[in-house]
Amino acid sequence: MVRKGDKKLAKPPTTKAANSQPRRRATQRRRSGRADAPLAKASTITGFGRATNDVHISGMSRIAQAVVPAGTGTDGKIVVDSTIVPELLPRLGHAARIFQRYAVETLEFEIQPMCPANTGGGYVAGFLPDPTDNDHTFDALQATRGAVVAKWWESRTVRPQYTRTLLWTSTGKEQRLTSPGRLVLLCVGSNTDVVNVSVMCRWSVRLSVPSLETPEDTTAPITTQAPLHNDSINNGYTGFRSILLGATQLDLAPANAVFVTDKPLPIDYNLGVGDVDRAVYWHLRKKAGDTQVPAGYFDWGLWDDFNKTFTVGAPYYSDQQPRQILLPAGTLFTRVDSEN
């Protein structure tokens, strides 16, 4: 040690080097038994599966049944006229209520007559890919793919050509968007014995786009095949015979079923001596038939949708007007009462 006199020399001051790495602090862990604070969290709806998970369904259903009394069959008489929609097939109709779109994968029709083997006359059956096509003559049906011609006592299978594009399950006025086509069966010649014919449909479809619709929204409209003329209505009556419209589905409709038409029905009625006025009706109610007219009748009138009541309209008054069409062929009948 260097001494200068009796005093010590002081050491130079030293500085501590700064730590390049900060000191690591221990984090406090939350107790595992303590629950999180309640928070509002969004939940996802489950049960739909994958977005592309379509449903395939198949089955066999009777779509029509008709009786042709002996000797009543004539060339071109319509026996069956059915527009193919989901509601026409019971199993498919229930399943289609939870989907918006469907595509037909297979479609076949079995014509099954029940009559003696010596019954004269026959039938032609064909499938019209356009459900709005009004040309259902023998030549038009025979020109379609899969059409058949047979004697009344012979069974045949119609294997038609149909669209495979997606259609809508809920029916509307534009039937090309909701139906793959129509099956039509016509008489050929006169049947010498009574014929009971059933039409079975073998089908398979693909359902897509899940949804939910009520049965009232999926009622299929019925297309008339013959015009209604004013001279077909009796003077003083409030209705007409169902067979005048040429639609088997309307003939088979139950009593008290109420339909709305897409075209107005003008009815002339008497206001007094020499005074005639015209009313326009949009609703018709089916009335039970009798021994002379088993298919029943249709009454025109006013429909109260709120109270679900039908009021019969004014009686028809002829006044010897010239023949005119009141409802043209191709008029759509859509059921509106609560029993559909």
UniProtKB/Swiss-Prot annotation:
InterPro entries per the UniProt record, alphabetical: Nodavirus_capsid, Viral_coat
Task: Give Gene Ontology CC terms.
Answer: T=3 icosahedral viral capsid
Q: Does the keyword rRNA processing apply?
A: no
Bilayer-spanning residue ranges:
none
| Compositionally biased intervals (Basic residues) | 22-32
Q: Is Mitochondrion among the key words of this record?
A: no
Reading the lineage from the top rank, the first entry is: Viruses
Q: Where is this region: Disordered?
A: 1-39
UniProt KW keywords = Capsid protein, T=3 icosahedral capsid protein, Virion
- Please describe what this protein does: Capsid protein alpha self-assembles to form an icosahedral procapsid with a T=3 symmetry, about 30 nm in diameter, and consisting of 60 capsid proteins trimers. The capsid encapsulates the two genomic RNAs.
Q: Which family does it belong to?
A: Belongs to the peptidase A6 family.
Protein's name in the database: Capsid protein alpha
Organism of origin: Striped jack nervous necrosis virus (SjNNV)
Give the taxonomic lineage as stored in the record.
Answer: Viruses, Riboviria, Orthornavirae, Kitrinoviricota, Magsaviricetes
* Protein's gene: alpha
